Amino acid sequence: MKARALPDGFAAYVWAPSSAEVAERHGLRPEQVLRYDQNTPPVPGVPQVPLAESFARLNEYPEGTYRELREAAAAYSGVEPEQVVVGAGADDLIATCARTFLGPGRRAAWNPPTYALYRIATHLEGAELAVEPDGADLIWVCNPNNPTGELVAPEEVAALARAHPQAAVVVDEAYFEYAGGATCAPLLAEAPNLVVLRTLSKAFGFASLRVGYALAAPEVAAHLELRRAPAPIAGPAARIAAAALREPRFDVAGDVAERDRVRDALLGVGYDCPATFTNFVWVRSDEPLGERLEEQGLVVRRFAEGIRITLRRPTENDVVLRALGAEPGPPPGRGAYVARTTTETALRLSLDLDGSGRVRVATGIGFLDHLLTLLAFHAAFDLELVAGGDLDVDEHHTVEDVLAALGDGLAQALGAREGVARYGSATVPMDEARATAAVDLVRRPHAEIALAFGSDRVGGLALTLLPHALERFAMQACCTVHVESAGRDDHHVAEAAFKALGQALRQAVAPGGAGVRSTKGEA
């Protein structure tokens, strides 16, 4: 057996090292690693279709024409369904375009630095790659560009297509939602050699679904359709993507404002950062900035010409800004970032009080993850919490440190505690169980916790740890917390308690006028 030879000097796509690899390389723990390298949102998109229904059909192949998805993409893009070709992410469609327009004896053009997959797809088809577009069979255009973030006006791209009618001009618009909607899609009629690629991995937050789509003139789309795989997108992914395109729920305005804040901070200390129209910031530098950041557990995408920093939550962006010597301006909103490492635990926590209940918790203790997810969801907080502890001993240190960190995060996010409702209370029935919770956010740390459990453990969690952990939460948050819960099922007793606390916190942190609400005049 002999594989087909690759061009001399061929280089495959290389991912950045995993968090585990970074941690091992620099004597850290994986929980200490923050990633700024994937150009995806810090929180996932929210599926708008019943997942249970989709998963119940895992034994079936997807509907081969992807009609529902193509119609949704067409409506979102302002074209006809016959102009849409779908694929497993824009990467799959890049390969499809190369398969359609390139081959031995053909040539593609690009303008580096840009997305490396254009080079790889070109060479895998046995074609040549050059910078000069004259005589090219395919011209790759990343717009906005990755990794520099720069934007070419759609009219200029259309002029390029008209100047090279023999070439397919493939415009990768993976980040167009961050560029104020600047797109070449309306120009397909006047420049039929244009092909526009898009993805749901960026603004939509569905990178793991691997869904992308191409827009082209009907005859060009037909050529692409002939060369795509029979069923490149999983059925559940296609249904989630179609629903998201029909009713987009992302909001890039906050990302754009944060992008400008981060760039301004870097410009303020002398870094060379061009204007960017994406969800990342490009820093031109020949210094080993990426290596220095990685030593601190901060992973950016490294290039010969500089580094690319993906935007995360504002408080997390401040971490990388300070590591680069920049003094960030005040972050928008009410957020917090907590990182803590001891000989017993390592954890990091990102909290946004003005979120929508998007939660990712991974502590290594399944039932604790479940309870914290309930608390954050019912409080309408966005929470990401990753922790690793000495679970080989027992779960005590992890449970206590996680709740303490959550309290620290709440205190940090509340700041001066001005303009909040201050008080919150809730009663939650959970089948036979019933819980009540009351919260006072003024700086009077106190806790009264009464959880009536009938056994020692649920789901690998020692229930006796929960009262003390909630006390630590109250002390670190510097607030008063009362929680009572009782019932016949210990699982329900615990769930009701954390749901009630979440509901009470939701009320207490809500905007409630100016100052701190207190008849004493000062709190």
Regions found by a protein language model. Give the residues of each.
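N-terminal small-domain helix-loop-helix segment of the aminotransferase-like
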Residues: 2-91, 96
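Short beta-strand
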Residues: 35, 197, 272-276, 300-302, ...
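Conserved core of the PLP fold type I
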Residues: 57-164, 175-191, 195, 317
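PLP-dependent enzyme catalytic core of the Aspartate aminotransferase-like
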Residues: 155, 301, 305-331
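Structural preference for solvent-exposed beta-strand-turn elements
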Residues: 179, 328-523
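PLP-dependent aminotransferase class I/II
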Residues: 193-273
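Conserved PLP-binding catalytic core of the aspartate aminotransferase-like
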Residues: 256, 263-296, 307-313
